[in-house]
Structure formats: structure tokens, C-alpha cells
């Protein structure tokens, strides 16, 4: 699944929102493909991608997106991982659709990445040409 999500060897990945309910197999697959452990906490470097585990009771999604966007390389994706429909703390897709443009992001795709988790890919919007 990590390769399908666009992760490549050598990628530095910032992980935010990790919890006991996060999917261990997906995390291990990403670590295996990239060859690197996740970066978390206070970041001092630019990362190639962000993995943001997000649940309905986690607070303001716009704030979380803006926070992680500061560390992301140009063109790098933010993968917002949310519990699937019917799972505890499910996030409505419209919540992501509403938050993304406010944070300066565009939604590009959504994948089923684990039994309990969906992943929505967000990227920075391109500046409009004049």
C-alpha cells in the first residue's frame, strides 16, 4: 500500500496524530518502503510527505494541516488518515473537503488503506497564473 500511496525509498515522513488505534501494518509498510523511521514531534527539517492520523474528536483540522504544511517540501503530499464509516471517531469526507482549501490545499484522491482506515491525499494548491 505504501508504494501505491507514492512513498519511495529515502523519503522522510512526518507522522502526526499517532494513537493506539493507528494501523500498525500500514505504518510498517511505509517504514519498509522508505527505509526510514517516522519523524514526529518538533521537526527541524523539511519532509517529503506527512502522515496525519485524524479522528472526529481531534480538534480543528485546518490548524493541524497548517501546522504540518510548514515542514513539507514543495509538491509533497499530506495523507489524512481517518476511521472508515461506521468506525469510532469517523470523520465525514466533507470535513476534509472544507478544511483543505482553507489550509491552502487541494484534495486529489482517497484510498482504502487498511481495514479501519481511509487515506485522503492533499497537496498544496498551485498559484494561479496571471
Regions found by a protein language model. Give the residues of each.
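S-adenosyl-L-methionine-dependent methyltransferase catalytic core, i.e., the SAM/SAH-binding region
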Residues: 1-130
